[in-house]
């Protein structure tokens, strides 16, 4: 009696779907390993789970994924890595030009006595330094303003605490005065009425 074939459709139960994924993944990777060893085939298997986790297999005869993809590009006349390489090259050039510019500005900022500067370049340096000073002052003022607000809030909280304590003291004093007054009043009544 043969195994019953189930209809191939998406498994609705997430737990069962995950369990089936892991079992079938292991079977797929086992078959890939067997194919690579038995037939001496170069094989690259990439698998992403539903959660986005990557699983991969590369046959032992292939040195790296990059070489495998380059071989694929050469065989199929497509460019898998070309766009990525071009983007990276453009990014490197951009970063390199930014580094050159920053190094030039840094050298310019450190005025060397032995070096000759033109009046316009010195004016530009002065302008840059003034702009930097304005930025520093602005940031300092912002920080000081924040500290002042923080301290004012603490003072306000302490004053409210103080007012609350003063109210409690006044209320306690009033209760004490009322208590003392009622005691003396009751003593006075007792004396007058002769209940002592």
From Swiss-Prot:
Keywords, sorted A to Z: DNA-binding, Nucleus, Transcription, Transcription regulation
Span of domain MADS-box: 1-61
Top-level taxon of origin: Eukaryota
PROSITE patterns the UniProt entry points to: K_BOX, MADS_BOX_1, MADS_BOX_2
A GO MF term: RNA polymerase II cis-regulatory region sequence-specific DNA binding
K-box domain: residues covered: 85-175
Disulfide bonds: none
Subcellular location field: Nucleus
Physiological role: Probable transcription factor.
Name of the molecule in the record: MADS-box transcription factor 32
């Amino acid at each position: 009696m043969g195994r019953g074939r189930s209809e191939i459709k998406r498994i609705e139960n997430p737990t069962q779907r995950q369990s089936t994924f892991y079992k079938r993944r292991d079977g797929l990777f086992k078959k890939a390993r067997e194919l690579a060893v038995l037939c001496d085939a170069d094989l690259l298997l990439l698998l992403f789970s539903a959660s986005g986790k990557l699983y991969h297999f590369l046959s032992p005869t292939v040195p790296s994924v990059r070489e495998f993809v380059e071989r694929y590009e050469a065989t199929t006349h497509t460019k898998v890595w070309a766009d990525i390489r071009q983007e990276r090259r453009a990014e490197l050039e951009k970063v390199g030009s930014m580094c050159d510019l920053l190094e030039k500005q840094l050298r310019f900022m450190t005025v060397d006595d032995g070096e000759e500067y033109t009046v316009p370049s010195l004016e530009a340096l002065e302008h840059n330094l003034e702009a930097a000073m304005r930025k520093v002052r602005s940031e300092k003022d912002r920080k000081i303003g924040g500290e002042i607000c923080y301290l004012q809030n603490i003072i306000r909280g302490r004053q409210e605490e103080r007012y609350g304590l003063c109210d409690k003291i006044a209320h306690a004093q009033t209760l004490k005065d009322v208590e003392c007054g009622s005691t003396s009043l009751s003593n006075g009544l007792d004396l007058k009425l002769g209940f002592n």
